[in-house]
A protein has these predicted regions:
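C-terminal motif of bacterial Sec signal peptides marking the signal peptidase cleavage site
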Residues: 32-33
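Extracytoplasmic ligand/sensor domains, especially the bilobed periplasmic-binding protein
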Residues: 118-228, 279-304
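Extracellular/periplasmic periplasmic-binding protein-like sensory domains
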Residues: 151, 270-346, 358-359, 416, ...
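Solvent-exposed, acidic/polar segments of extracytosolic/periplasmic ligand-binding ectodomains
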Residues: 373-438
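Extracellular/periplasmic bilobed ligand-binding domains
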Residues: 211-311
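N-terminal secretory signal peptides
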Residues: 1-13, 20-29
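Extracytoplasmic "Venus flytrap"
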Residues: 48-74, 96-103, 125-126, 201-210, ...
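Beta-alpha junction/loop-to-helix N-cap segments that form part of ligand/metal-binding clefts
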Residues: 37-43, 62-69, 81-159, 172, ...
């Protein structure tokens, strides 16, 4: 077993992964060449320019599926502008595709900061996109809010410590504590008996490093035996060694945090080579219907954490839609099945508007960044509180466990997730019981 005994995280113990991209934004670098850094925007004061970066293409493209729907809805929401401090501002959202690539993410961040002169950056989905954009904003003193990355991978992965937090970059999402609580609740109370041996595939990337250092020790303390063949590289094509280790240990629970194409390769090889756990709880993939559909019948029975679903009993502060209404709106407008990124990305803009309205001058970068750090509100994704997070700059959010099943009851879609464990969040209703994979 390669999981360390110490569950604490430090800036040294988590792979920075995307740190090289931040070099574009150091003093004397690109920003200086483009005219330096100013504490307020050079754009017309009556216009608030919001940059939005997400992976719309590349390995993490599934996370960008809701973008067109959200951009249309949000631009309509902001068509009359925002009134802040007695002054009316028009709002422009400038969206960019990171292509699921850290270097591209850094480049589009540079363009938004230096050419578009944005006042606020919003960025979402995976460390490969979020971390380089956040690094760029911290260096340029641009307020930035992000989501859909485990907070430890965002915080420690970018070099922060409780003694030296960030000034301009803020984040909300789940972390190791939420994952640990959700997984152990499902694995012990879900009704599927196991030998409590967990085969893990945690990659050599920011997510994998944070999970190995944080989640592994906590699972061990909770009485699970971790079967860890070691970190693997993203893009690996042959998982025979890992599969052999899991079979030898009879790991009846499986957990992984891979890129979607990597999991598809592994899961097919696992079935071919005779590894079939009783429970498989996955993250970073298996979160979206398209990712499950791509697996065909092999996707049935996989479980995953859900940070948003139509069952969440919350309402958007921007559109006044309940979670169910927002999901139905998406399906009617696009013909596609809802996915949980809709909730987190809508909440991203909800927090942004809350912070903008809390300032006397939304173009004062320092004031806007401070307002993000004081934000406390209930969004369509649930309650967020940046004043009492696990560390400065961070708020966590609810997480429940769902299981993917073949759609029934005349559904127009191929698969459907069922909430099978709500843990500490009793106000989020369960829809069924966990079913074993074998």
């Amino acid at each position: 077993m390669n999981t360390p005994a110490n569950g604490s995280l430090s800036r040294r113990s988590v792979l920075r992964g995307t740190a090289g991209a931040a070099g574009l934004f150091t003093a004397g670098g690109l920003l200086t060449a483009c005219g330096g850094i100013k504490e307020s925007s050079a754009q017309t004061d009556a216009v608030l320019r919001i940059g939005y970066v997400s992976p719309s293409t590349g390995p993490a493209a599934g996370f960008g599926e809701p973008n067109a729907f959200l951009m249309k809805k949000l631009r309509a929401t902001f068509k009359d502008g925002l009134k802040i401090g007695g002054k009316k501002y028009s709002v422009e959202i400038i969206d960019r595709d990171s292509q699921s690539n850290p270097q591209t993410a850094a480049q589009v961040a540079a363009d938004l900061i230096n050419s578009e002169k944005i006042d606020l950056m919003l960025v979402t989905s995976t460390p490969e996109t979020v971390n380089p954009v956040a690094d760029a904003c911290e260096a340029a003193k641009i307020p930035c809010l992000s989501t859909a990355v485990p907070w430890e991978a965002w915080y420690f992965g970018r070099g922060a410590t409780p003694e030296k937090p960030f000034t301009y970059t803020y984040h909300f999402f789940i972390g190791v504590a939420e994952l640990h609580a959700a997984y152990t609740s499902l694995w012990t109370k879900g009704g599927v008996e196991t030998n409590r041996r967990v085969g893990v595939m945690w990659p050599n990337d920011p997510d994998g490093k944070a999970i190995r250092q944080g989640l592994g020790p906590q699972l061990t303390k909770s009485g699970f035996t971790i079967v860890d063949p070691g970190a693997y590289e993203d893009g690996t094509n042959d998982y025979s060694a890992q599969i052999a280790a899991f079979k030898k240990a009879d790991a009846e629970i499986f957990n992984t945090f891979p890129l979607p194409p990597d999991f598809a390769t592994f899961w097919k090889q696992a079935r071919q080579q005779g590894y079939r756990p009783r429970i498989a709880s996955i993250a970073k993939t298996g979160l979206l219907p398209s990712q499950i559909e791509a697996l065909g019948p092999l996707g049935y029975g996989l479980s995953a954490g859900f940070w948003w679903s139509p069952e969440f009993p919350f309402t958007s502060t921007l559109t006044d839609q309940t979670a169910r209404q927002l999901a139905d709106d998406y399906e009617k407008s696009t013909g596609k099945q809802w996915n949980q990124v809709i909730g987190s990305n809508m909440a991203l803009f909800e927090v942004a508007v809350h912070a903008l309205k809390a300032t006397s001058d939304p173009k004062d970068r320092g004031e806007l960044a401070a307002a993000l750090g004081k934000a406390k509100l209930t969004t369509v994704a649930g309650p967020l509180d940046f004043t009492s997070g696990p560390v400065k700059n961070v708020s966590t959010e609810p997480l429940v466990m769902g299981q993917w099943r073949k759609a029934t009851g005349g559904s127009t879609f191929a698969v459907e997730p069922v909430i099978v464990d709500n843990g500490a969040f009793g106000d989020i209703p369960r829809g069924g019981e966990l079913e074993p994979l074998r």
